[in-house]
Amino acid sequence: MRFGKEFVSQMIPEWQEAYIDYAYLKTILQDIQASRNRSDSNNQSSTPSFARNLTRRYNRDALVSENHDIVVNTVTRLEEGLETAAYETTFLKAGEAGGDFEVTFFRTLDREFNKVNNFYRLKVETARTEALALNKQMDALIAFRHKVMDQNQKNPSVFDSVSEDINGSASEVGSSSKCTEHNVALADLMRNEDTSNESILERIRMNKTREITPLSAIKTILKVHKQDELKFTRDNLKEVEKRLQVAFIEFYQKLRHLKNYSFLNASAVSKIMKKYDKIAKRNAAKLYMEMVDKSFLSSSEEVHKLLLKVESIFIEHFSNSNRREGMSHLRPKINKERHLITFSTGFFFGCGISLIVALGLIIHARNIMGTPGQRTYMETMFPLYRFFGFVVLHMDVYAANIYFWRRYRVNYSFIFGFKQGTELGYRHVLLLSFGLGTLSLCAVLLNLDMEMDAQTKDYRLVTELIPLFLLVLVIIIVLCPFNILYRSSRFFFLSVLFRCIAAPFYAVHLPDFFLGDQLTSQVQALRSLEFYICYYGFGDFRYRRRNTCTSNIGFRTFYFIVAVIPYWLRFLQCIRRMVEDRDLSHGYNGIKYLLTIVAASLRTAYTLNRGSNWNITAWVFSGVATFYGTYWDIVLDWGLLQRGCKNSFLRDKLLVPHKTVYYAAMVLNVLLRLVWLQTVLDLKFSFLHRETMVALMACLEIIRRGIWNFFRLENEHLNNVGRYRAFKTVPLPFNYEEDGDHHNN
């Protein structure tokens, strides 16, 4: 792999603007090369051959002996009221042919390197601050452990060694710095003023971040103080250790990213200078790299020292001195693409295609669509099986989302908060999707075969139960507690789903409202689940020809309620965020879902009770809800249609290089949001059953949601890039009274 591609692939996506602009520097080198080629061609046409050879030999000898193509100076600049060191390169041969391009090259390189050096210095300063916070947290943990452990313990020095290790880390890190002021500051920060456990316990309180009950959630909303008095129990000790373990892991990841950032940028400067020397026939790389090696970016060993100490402390005190176990937490293995996954995905895909073809042939050969029971089958069995079709389609769309997020470097695993090493790739999702699709198609074919075969008519009851068996199997797999079939992802999904259902009582994070939005596109799937309950719960499956669900008052009532539930949950999430964040924009977002609730209810009412009044009312509210929702999708969720941006009617930053993709997505979003017109216009096609039409409209909504997913996360990613937000904030378990709450917010 060429360095340019490797450089981009190893970037931290949220920090991409803070890296050396390697691609732009290469374009300047191309200008230098073109200029020198023109100069050489002019010299060749005007200089005799013998004289030209002598001149070329003389210039080559001069290049070897002359090392003063550039002079690198250190200057002091005032930025935001602070004096910072910067580097300026003076090109000494600007008067030569093409010298203006070389001046531009060094000016750009200096600007890029100073940007990188200052950014790295700022992040190291932040790491120092976090090291201080973790040091104080460890002091509190030591004191807390003493209190929990047996009071008659004679040898507490085992626990005290943790604080000594961290303090020693601070001293060693400080001594490695080239800046004396930083040495003193870091040593002062990391040194405990009072090592007395009792005095520490007097100055700390526990920060409770878990919202287990509605009462704790209400206290959070009302801004009741979240600090509890210290209760020296083993449960609290386990909770503190767990949260500190997460904090150390996250801090370690930050340090690794910083180390990688330093190495990549130094390598980029080295590569670009070697290219410059080769193209311009200069000898400037050695002198410039001497400056780079002496800069803070390359000379500071603080990050390396902290990495070693964090490893030592974590292994000793969070992994029982088991290095392999400790490093498995600090450096989790990256999921590797296995050939078995690819093979299995292709196998299930082939099986699915074959089963679809077989299904079509059976329907045609046996003339199932022309049989008297076709209408009854479409009103009973089809709503049961189409649930799996909706799920499979949504999983396929999500797999496509993952593929394009990875292709355009959208850090979806960080945005969703997936644990490193457990996130699913698009191949894994497709494997599950095609597997479920194959299983569902097998059930459909088995059902049809048993229905049409005279020898199995005595087992009609078993035939009717096949969809229920399939649903129960899927539920068992999702709830399976064993570590099979991506347990971490299944449990993550279930936890997010639970928080969606309990929306008012839990803080709302991006995965919560993202899943809530997915549910709003699965209304027909939820109605299929309702039909499962009615069809099997009330015994209609025993007498298929006597389907009483559609005429049941309770079923018709819940037919309304089920369509409203996803939008109502999203509305509650918006209200919770508005109250918690004191941000009215969440309230305006809630209005969108409230309008959709009214519009969906009116359309459902019109479907069940035809009439001009219902039709007109459904038209009006559906139109308003569609306009409001489309505006919110495109302008706020996607961040498009910005005024004064360099990309007309889009935004300044675009990850997809083709603008037509964004324009097409906006048009498709509008068109697919208008699928409700089929309901109010009462469109019918002779070759399509009404249930088939409903299923097609639901599939179009799922596809629209997939398009929305990509651009929604793209916009979220670009917001993180603008704020250089590449790490999650980990709440610490203890709060020191003199520090205030801001350390843990």
Curated annotation (Swiss-Prot):
Cell location: Cell membrane
Lineage top rank: taxon: Eukaryota
Membership in a protein family: Belongs to the SYG1 (TC 2.A.94) family.
Lineage: Eukaryota, Viridiplantae, Streptophyta, Embryophyta, Tracheophyta
Record organism: Arabidopsis thaliana (Mouse-ear cress)
UniProt KW Nucleotidyltransferase keyword: no
Entry-linked InterPro entries: EXS_C, PHO1_SPX, SPX_dom
Domain SPX: 1-290
Keywords carried by this UniProt record: Cell membrane, Membrane, Phosphate transport, Transmembrane, Transmembrane helix, Transport
Main location: membrane
The protein's name in its UniProt record: Phosphate transporter PHO1 homolog 4
Matches recorded under PANTHER family: PHOSPHATE TRANSPORTER PHO1 HOMOLOG 4, XENOTROPIC AND POLYTROPIC RETROVIRUS RECEPTOR 1-RELATED
Tissues where the protein occurs: Expressed in root epidermis and cortex, leaf hydathodes, pollen grains and stigma apex.
TM spans (from-to): 343-363, 384-404, 428-448, 465-485, 616-636, 661-681
A single GO cellular-component term on record: nucleus
Gene Ontology annotations of biological process type: endosperm development; phosphate ion transport; positive regulation of cell size; red or far-red light signaling pathway; regulation of gene expression; regulation of seed development; regulation of seed growth
Membrane topology, record value: Multi-pass membrane protein
Keyword Transport (UniProt): yes
Residue ranges occupied by any EXS domain in the UniProt entry: 550-744
Gene designation per UniProt: PHO1-H4
Extracellular topological domain: 364-383, 449-464, 637-660
Induction, per UniProt: Not induced by Pi deficiency.
Protein task: May transport inorganic phosphate (Pi).
Residue intervals annotated with topology Cytoplasmic: 1-342, 405-427, 486-615, 682-745
